[in-house]
């Protein structure tokens, strides 16, 4: 993994120092907090990954001189930082960067004050946001302030008791995953290893759901890494040794195939090829004699994951076909046309608004 934390601090320093005389070392006790989320936070990045960041600031720690508003200043710094990472040059780019996991991204600035963030999470924070913070870590800027923020947020993430509404919300997250287009069955050619049935997201949700339920009372379950969490869930008796072993074997297997898919054409993809010649190519690249051998290995893992995942939610009703007659996809940078159509058929007058609000649940 690229030493983004050190690099980002250097960028912040070089960007801030020429503009101000109020802070000599912006990477030290500046109150500027950059949290890494998702696979970046858990040190589980793909070969071709976006990185998910949330940026906060503590105005009490860093007060710009000259009457400059702290919010304006830190928004500007964040915008410049993201531009440096995402801008394509002859040498390429550093990372595609996504800031949309912050509180209410459609209505808030890209850098929020710590107080505003805490108030949001304490009053209207959602369970999907609690799940997202399982993998959060301070990665740049004022690391000590970032770690202090996560400690303060800990009671929100790790509740000692879950009420029925919270558990129902977790079940709703599961149903939404199953509503994803292409999730109805296991298909090999064209199967999405991340979002499809038996895929990577099911393993991660299998783990995170049980962490949310038990982590408030058992602090050793509060770990960001998927494989470490599986080990600890087994040790605590939440899952059986065979289940832990099979899920722990399937996760790196599926991730390794995902990496190779992204290496093949240097693009961000999670789906196995539909064309036979491309499938043979990825099979050989993955160390298999032919496509049939790879297909057999992939199907075995997908079916294993599907079995364990379904057992965890065996009493959860499926999303009603009458309520959702078509596709429901809430990921991606643009609205899925089939999802817009489905929501319109369900009676929503503004499908794009609905997609924007629900899309933050996919982390």
PLM features: residue spans?
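Long, amphipathic alpha-helical stalk/connector segments used for oligomerization, subunit docking
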Residues: 103-109, 114-200, 213, 302
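Polyanionic (Asp/Glu-rich) segments that form extended negatively charged tracts
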Residues: 60-62, 125-128, 205, 227, ...
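Conserved catalytic core of two-metal-ion nucleotidyltransferases
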Residues: 12-35, 64-123
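Single conserved hydrophobic/aromatic residue that forms the stacking wall/gate
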Residues: 1-12, 361
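A glycine-rich phosphate-binding loop feature that marks nucleotide/adenosyl-phosphate handling sites
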Residues: 17-32, 94-110, 172-175, 194-198, ...
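Long, hydrophobic, amphipathic alpha-helical segments used as structural scaffolds
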Residues: 9, 14-17, 85, 89-93, ...
